[in-house]
Amino acid sequence: MLTYTPPDSRKPAKTYEKPWLLLLMVFAWLWPGVFSHDLWNPAEPVVFTALEALRHGASPLVADVLGQADFKIPPVYLWTAAAFQNLLSPWAADAYSAARFASVFFTAAGLACCGFAGFNLLGRHHGRSVVLILAGCVGLLSMAHFLSGLSVTFAALSMILCGFSLAHKKVITGALLLGGGWALLSLSAGFLLTAVLVLTALLLPLHPQWRFKRYALTLVGAFAVGLPLMVVYPFLLHRLQPAAFDLWLNTRSLGAFGGLADFQTAFNLPYYLKNLIWFAFPTWPLMAWTYTRIRIGAQRWSVLGTAWIGAAAVLLAVNPETYQDHLVWLLPPMALLGAAQLDGLRRGAAAFINWFGIMTFGFLAVFLWIGFFAMNYGWPAKLAERAAYFSPYYVPDIDPAPMAVALLFTPLWLWAITRKNIRGRQAVTNWAAGVTLAWALLMTLFLPWLDAAKSHAPVVQQMEAALAPELKQRFSDGLECISVAAADHRTRIAWTQYGSLKLNVDDAACRYRLVQQPKNTAPPQGWTQIWQGARPRNKVEGFALLEKAE
């Protein structure tokens, strides 16, 4: 008995895990897709236009897209993107890539907060499991690597989760994260989702697991921090831009649900359930496994995760927007619950996840490598023909740097999947490594091919190349002009970013008009079509240059 040591005071058993490998993989996961491509629809052209307006003196409180307020773009995202542009462009990255660093920044912050939440709530080693599960979610890829305000929402939700996780031991830090997360969420996702999560925090003490003094103090501190911060933006907007404040209050203050004068709901639960299957895999099967192994009310983290998921699911069910990225509202608590019983995952289930990941990403990697040779060297011929069909503007381009990245990622993945004694955590690690490999190959080997298909630059360049030199000179000298409709934002943004000709907005005096219409649409009476074009295989979007008949 004299040598007895209480279990809590014993040193943790030594493990052979290497946390630096996790950091290396997350670092590798963060960067593919950030560099070396144009602005891709649907969000990037609009976000970058608002960013340019901010850098040229537009209001920092409201995203300005061609003179119109766009409250879907969080101002804090534009501030961060502008800071990265000032810091990195043009010496370290082009303007587009530098702006995308904002998404990387918020995503990295979100992953870090979720990792700490897992460590605080679940214990040693579980923090990295939460991060690996999130890195394996395909739904997180676009908002993490492209210009998207959803990365701010992810960071805010992760801060809130981390704040909850610290309530039992670090009241001040927990209150700062919880209150700061609420404030950041109100800026990015509106006040309805924020209010629902605040209400969830207030109702948690109804359960005995959350009925302790430190949590009450954390809540008091969170309100002391969060409420003043949440009021700052509406107050400044009301004082400095009253008209914009009224528009925001009535149409966007509640986020996707509209505003006080335009509140909307719709039943879209089937849409979100259908998309959750691929968006949040492997979080949902791992979460389901956890629920079969525990009593929901027995653990603090299970009560929190269940309450959060239930509240967010109700909002998603009545969300009027059918936009899959809103499922990010569920990712942090689902990843937490998925990691809770990961080490207890049965060998058969772990082996299946591992096998499914190896087959899926292995075949995808082989296809991407074969596709790379097909599009650049013409072999296999049938695949080369299909590649040219879907991206006819692509010109074979082999850049040594992306090739080196692709060549590095492939053997690293092969090394990762050859480990023996696969258990739950190793299976999730291999899945995340497979997602990283597939994304890296897609954003290196296929990047020029994708850019030629998704960017408007080839279309704009085709139009300008089709103009007679004399006519182009008349446009440059101001003797002729091209008019474009003020409401045609897509055309205006595309020609501003990639064209050299000036467009006049709603100028009836111009003899030429640039319009957006499907290809092979007949010109209106009194006009002659002198050019038409569209991105490859796009049957809805098209552009045409019309000349007024004499």
Each language-model region and where it sits:
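Membrane-integral, polyisoprenol-dependent glycosyltransferases
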Residues: M1-A351, W495, A534-G542
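Membrane-embedded architecture of ER/inner-membrane glycosylation machinery
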Residues: L2-P12, Y16, A167-L187, T194-A195, ...
